[in-house]
């Protein structure tokens, strides 16, 4: 489980609980009783499904407040959508908030986002480098409603003071998941959102605001 306040519910967990070989052998009333109890005991319940296990997905999908789709970035969006036809055709697809998590094996430049958004029209989307611990930690915080955002103000050259502030945040162990800003604060926020460290931002500032002298 992700935290004491949440739980992860899987088909195998239900089978183990009822000592059953197939989820269709479990009486719906008994399964619903179990799921109701789990949802009452925890603030957040994550029902884990896969396209290969249709019966389980159809049982838990009506309970969903949100649908999170974890998809392989190396696949074509149209191909992926075709493979989840039963989900796309479900009532929940039209009525429930959809979140797209696009998984990347490498750490190179992300491209092709527009195709994914056009094909799935999610309410929110994330790009996750699966080998990056920071990415996984950020996603976990979002799943638990613990994301932390930072918005930086403007002020021309005074905005460079944000660098010192970020050094202090780093020293305190604070990690931010969202960045926003206005004027020079937006520029600084964009660099932070790209993962640049304070020292790298100083180099970028010198290149774009001193050497080139805009």
Q: Which role fits each region the language model picked out?
A:
Residues 1-22, 139, 184-185:
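Walker A/P-loop phosphate-binding motif and the immediately C-terminal alpha-helix
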Residues 7, 44-46, 147-149:
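Residue-level preference for the first positions of well-ordered beta-strands
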Residues 9, 99-103, 178-180:
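Short internal beta-strands
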Residues 11-28, 33, 43, 79:
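TRAFAC-class small GTPase G-domain
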Residues 14-18, 108, 130-138:
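A short acidic, often aromatic-flanked loop/helix-cap motif at beta-alpha or helix-coil junctions
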Residues 31-35, 40-41, 45-131:
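Conserved catalytic-core segment of NTP-binding enzymes
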Residues 122-147:
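Extreme N-terminal, non-catalytic leader segments
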Residues 149-151, 156-214:
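Patatin-like phospholipase
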């Amino acid at each position: 489980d992700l935290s004491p306040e949440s739980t992860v519910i899987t088909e195998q967990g239900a089978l183990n609980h009822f000592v059953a070989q197939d989820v269709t052998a479990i009486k719906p009333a008994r399964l619903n009783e179990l799921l109701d109890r789990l949802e009452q005991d925890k603030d957040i319940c994550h029902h884990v499904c896969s396209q290969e296990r249709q019966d389980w997905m159809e049982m838990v999908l009506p309970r969903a407040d949100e649908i999170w789709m974890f998809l392989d970035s190396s696949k074509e969006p149209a191909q992926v959508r075709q493979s989840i036809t039963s989900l796309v055709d479900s009532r929940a697809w039209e009525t429930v908030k959809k979140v797209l998590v696009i998984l990347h094996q490498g750490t190179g430049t992300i491209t092709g986002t527009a195709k994914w958004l056009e094909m799935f029209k999610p309410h929110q989307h994330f790009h996750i480098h699966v080998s990056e611990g920071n990415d996984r930690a950020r996603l976990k915080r979002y799943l638990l409603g613990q994301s932390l955002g930072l918005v930086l103000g403007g002020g021309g050259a005074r905005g460079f003071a944000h660098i010192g502030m970020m050094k202090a945040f780093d020293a305190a162990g604070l990690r931010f998941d969202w960045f926003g800003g206005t004027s020079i604060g937006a520029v600084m926020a964009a660099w932070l959102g790209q993962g640049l460290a304070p020292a790298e931002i100083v180099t970028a500032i010198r290149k774009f605001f001193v050497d080139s002298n805009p």
